[in-house]
């Protein structure tokens, strides 16, 4: 993918500016962590970024964006709806095809939810729903991944599994994270947001938890 250049992005709610102006460059091959306290503007920045690159991005929103009445398989399959003709998508809705089952099942196996393949999302726990949303983005195979707290409902080992899969599947990503240790381990650049502004932007190798904690 080409580099993404964001210039003077702003956002306002209720007449009050909550983000920006922010300028940010995202280079191919970068794994960027957005860090900062809740309400700092991370989700708003991700949403604005998605508006700029939606044609080449996979998104894991904080609210997950799953269809509760559909199965895990169908929610994951939705990651590639645009890649297939409508008749084929309808066919998969009625009776999942072998090709897609053979692609999606191993992905769910690695995420620890292959036994939920045909279960409706509404029957899942919060962590299982989160992994379903991540599986959908991984299956999409876009140029860039944007994820808003994709491991917030997962315990330590599972969080590492998911972050490892994300790093493996996507060469370029921007991920909002609360967990500083995960940000330092799986991302090579840290962008800290405070009060709607970029307060920190540096390579992970030059940072320690003590450099990031003041943002919280």
Model-identified regions with their sequence ranges:
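Conserved ABC ATPase "signature" region
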Residues: 89-116
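Conserved ABC ATPase signature
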Residues: 120-124, 128
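Hydrophobic anchor residue at the start of the ABC signature
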Residues: 134
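H-loop/switch region of ABC-family ATPase nucleotide-binding domains
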Residues: 177-178
């Amino acid at each position: 993918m080409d580099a993404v250049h964001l210039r003077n992005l702003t956002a306002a709610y209720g007449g009050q500016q909550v983000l920006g102006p922010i300028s940010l460059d995202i280079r191919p091959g970068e794994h960027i962590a957005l860090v900062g306290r809740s309400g700092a503007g991370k989700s708003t920045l991700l949403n604005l970024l998605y508006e700029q690159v939606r044609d080449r991005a996979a998104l894991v929103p904080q609210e997950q964006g799953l269809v509760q009445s559909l199965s895990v398989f169908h929610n994951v399959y939705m990651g590639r709806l645009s890649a297939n003709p409508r008749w084929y998508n309808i066919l998969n809705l009625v009776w999942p095809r072998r090709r897609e089952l053979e692609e999606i099942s191993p992905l769910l196996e690695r995420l620890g939810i292959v036994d939920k393949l045909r279960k409706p999302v509404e029957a899942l726990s919060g962590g299982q729903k989160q992994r379903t949303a991540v599986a959908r983005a991984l299956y999409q195979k876009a140029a860039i991944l944007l994820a808003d707290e994709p491991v917030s409902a997962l315990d330590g080992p599972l969080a590492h599994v998911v972050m490892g899969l994300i790093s493996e599947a996507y060469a370029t990503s921007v991920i909002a994270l609360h967990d500083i240790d995960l940000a330092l381990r799986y991302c090579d650049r840290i962008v800290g947001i405070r009060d709607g502004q970029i307060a920190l932007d540096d390579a992970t190798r030059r940072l320690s938890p003590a450099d990031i904690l003041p943002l919280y």
